[in-house]
Amino acid sequence: MGITAATEMALRRHLVAQLDNQLGGTSYRSVLMYPEKMPRPPWRHETHNYIRSGPGPRFLDAPGQPAGMVAAVVSDGTTVAAGYLTGSGSRAALTSTGRSQLERIAGSRTPLTLDLDGLGRYRVLAAPSRNGHDVIVTGLSMGNVDATMLQMLIIFGIVTVIALVAATTAGIVIIKRALAPLRRVAQTASEVVDLPLDRGEVKLPVRVPEPDANPSTEVGQLGSALNRMLDHIAAALSARQASETCVRQFVADASHELRTPLAAIRGYTELTQRIGDDPEAVAHAMSRVASETERITRLVEDLLLLARLDSGRPLERGPVDMSRLAVDAVSDAHVAGPDHQWALDLPPEPVVIPGDAARLHQVVTNLLANARVHTGPGTIVTTRLSTGPTHVVLQVIDNGPGIPAALQSEVFERFARGDTSRSRQAGSTGLGLAIVSAVVKAHNGTITVSSSPGYTEFAVRLPLDGWQPLESSPR
């Protein structure tokens, strides 16, 4: 709009200047054609061979005078002659209002713009005659100037409208193209909203397409952030599903493990009621009840320990002599399994680390019990302790039949079994290795297993330092 206004002003000044130049020539010719000595009224006494009849000054009929020209002769403030040239070249009279308008500008010597009565806008100029008494007023129509300006405004208007329509259309297209990735991001979010995330196994395959997740653009950064959020949610949902699955399996296995000794207790109790007069049979039944009760007690204690470890409750912290602990555990294992061969491989100096002595003793005891239960008589079980720059490594190695490859990834699961039967070897709760894994993890350590026929190794890595003494927790 500013450019249009500036162009209009410049063009109008140029056209008016051209008209003023033409007006100056017309005024000059009119002054030349006006006699120096002309009797004042009546005007009709003036004679020239080119004069035609009609109102107005006769110099309107001079050669070169343009059509539409107005002219007046003002003498002593009174218009003595006034008229204009029609399109056919004849003279016509001005209205009285038009004559008065020309009289009023007789004293001016610069071009002026007048809206002449009955004729329209004119550019007029007053000039003294050669006799020095009269004033010659001439004027040229501004119709061409106004028509040119109107045409220019129409052209500018059309061009402006076309430009606005084109700019608007281009803007809409550009905005739609720019917002298309954002719409796809919103579509992805809407698809996620429609997924049933509150139940069952949840899969979250929906992602923002890779081209819309380019971090080089703002929309791409949004898409990338949404993908990362969806990845995090998917991982959390998968973890939740895995946890729920483990809990369900754990509850099912725990129920089975408790159901078996409870059924035995109930059966032996009913048996004692039927054979009350047989002291030997009653004694045997009561011993079995006591055995199954002890089994339930161990199972419940193991479950409570795992629950405490799962909840992240801190263990007791203090210096633990791993060498002494290994010696004691192997001695106990030798008493429990005299048909096995037990060996120790310890460094010359005691190995002391920070930790919970009772739980670390349980780690070694459970590993040795696992080797004793799952290997045959005569198996050599070696307990080896070594130190590194930052860790202590405890290894329990046996030359038994080994662990099936399919089971090695599950040996630290709760109630893991090497076969499909629901039987459990005497004295085993099925939680020993699960407790080992949980205790080692609570000490910021790791445990691994490697096995093949004739060789099985459990390796526990525990940090040498980095533990801060904590208050003991309720056990």
Curated annotation (Swiss-Prot):
Residues 175-475 are cytoplasmic. Residues 1-153 are extracellular. Residues 253-466 form the Histidine kinase domain. It is found in: Cell membrane. One of its GO terms (cellular component) is cytosol. Its EC number is 2.7.13.3. The chain crosses the membrane at residues 154-174. Keywords: ATP-binding, Cell membrane, Kinase, Membrane, Nucleotide-binding, Phosphoprotein, Transferase, Transmembrane, Transmembrane helix, Two-component regulatory system. Autophosphorylated. One of its GO terms (molecular function) is ATP binding. GO terms for biological process: phosphorelay signal transduction system. It catalyses: ATP + protein L-histidine = ADP + protein N-phospho-L-histidine. Pfam families: HAMP, HATPase_c, HisKA. Homodimer. This is Probable sensor histidine kinase TcrY. It comes from Mycobacterium tuberculosis (strain ATCC 25618 / H37Rv). The gene is tcrY.
